[in-house]
Structures are given as C-alpha cells and as structure tokens.
Amino acid sequence: MARYLGIVSYDGSYFKGWAIQPNLATIQGLLEQSFSLIIGRKIKVIGSGRTDKGVHAINQTFHVDINGEINLNLLIRKINQLIKPHCIVKTLVLVNDSFHARFQVKTKVYEYLINCGNLNPLQFNYVWQLNQQLDLEKLKADATLFLGKKNFLSFSSSIHTDSIRTISKITIQKETNQLVRLTFFGSGFLRSQVRMIVACLVNLNTNKMALETVAKLFEHPKKGSCVVKAPSCGLYLKTVVYEK
C-alpha cells in the first residue's frame, strides 16, 4: 500500500461543499467515486480540510492509499476525464506512509475577492459583488485586529473544542479592475472564520460596525456571535503548506 498526496482545483459553485453528503454533489464524493472506479476497489480520499458550499479551491490537498505500481500521469488523466470540467486533479506524488493531508498542515492561505466596481453578471459566482468603494488604508488598519493567536469562536459557525487559531498575516490589494483581494495566512481556520472576518472588515469600513464590537467578540467568545458573514462565492483556498 502506497500513499499519494494530491492537489485538486475546483469551482465550488457546482458543489455542495467538500465533505461527502448523501445524494449531493461534493468534491470528496466525486473524487472517491472516480478513484474507486478506476482502481477497482473502495478508495478513501482525505482532504486537508473542508470547504463549504460555493467556496472554491485553487490548490486543495488530499491523500489516497493505493495498492501496486501505478502510472501517475495516466491515473491523473483518467481521473480528470471523470471529474472535469468543474474539478481537476493537478498532481499526485508519492509520500511517506505516515503523511496525513489534514494533521500535518503548517500553513493555509485563503483569498477573498470583492468587486467594488459595477455589478458584473459574469462574476456573481466568483466574487462578492459589493458595488461600493472601500477605503483600502482603513481595511489594512482594521485587519490588524485579527492578527495573532486568538480565540476565534465568535467568528465560527460551528462548535469547536479548541477555537484558538493563529493568523500570521493578512494582505490587502486593490487591482485596476476595482477588485479588492484579501489574503489570509494561518495555521488553520475555523468554519466560516475567513468569511466572518471579511464581513466585519467591510462593515467597519462602511461604518456599520464599531471597533468596540469587534473587541467584545474576542472578549466574550461565543459560537457565531459575529452574525455577519461574507458570501461563499468570493472565497478561495489558495495554498496548503506542509512541514518538510
């Protein structure tokens, strides 16, 4: 039995999320079905983590265990014939048997895209159509509130036994086409954490939320008390980095 690390990219608008759900189109379900069909036995796909309905991935990672010698390039081509066009396996590489796609993650990078310009019907599944200008310098200043090791339970839509997470860096760029790109670097993220932080930053920017409110969310952590959440369509899992 050999273990392989895979990288998959997908358009989340065509799926009900990563995790398998009965009678629903999910990325994990599609991959397991396709690998099992080609290999000829039940194959379990373990991802680096879950993405919600509508969330996209540029480089989501997973591992699979496969018996015998295989031609990786041929396997990738066969898999992609079954899962395209909205999901594509980019690479498969042999790794140590002890490797785990979820438990050995060092850093995850998420991007969130906001269109501050005119509404664009071609982008509705891929960016938050805010249709409102944002103060970039204020965005950057307010983003520092979320840096460091903190209890982010208020910024999660699920109960967690350990809601302490570390966000090491947040970068914010405005591009010429009125697109604002927020990039989050962290060791891991709670469910909906990035989307809730983005919504807070936008509300702070548009004077719909006070800085004191954010402080209270950290002082009195409670699941989902942040309330506001940016649309899933603007969120992308960009990179997953592992310990060497």
Swiss-Prot record:
Presence of keyword Zinc-finger: no
Top-level EC class as recorded in UniProt: isomerase
Catalysed reaction equations from the record: uridine(38/39/40) in tRNA = pseudouridine(38/39/40) in tRNA
Any Pfam family matching the protein: PseudoU_synth_1
Domain of life: Bacteria
Regions that span the bilayer: none
Location of the active site: 52
Keywords: Isomerase, tRNA processing
Disulfide bonds: none
GO BP: tRNA pseudouridine synthesis
Gene Ontology MF: a single term: pseudouridine synthase activity
Amino-acid positions noted as binding substrate in the UniProt annotation, renumbered to this chain: 110
EC number: 5.4.99.12
Classification via HAMAP family: TruA
Protein task: Formation of pseudouridine at positions 38, 39 and 40 in the anticodon stem and loop of transfer RNAs.
Binding partners and assembly: Homodimer.
Family as reported in the entry's similarity comment: Belongs to the tRNA pseudouridine synthase TruA family.
Protein name: tRNA pseudouridine synthase A
Source organism: Mycoplasma genitalium (strain ATCC 33530 / DSM 19775 / NCTC 10195 / G37)
Gene that produces this protein: truA
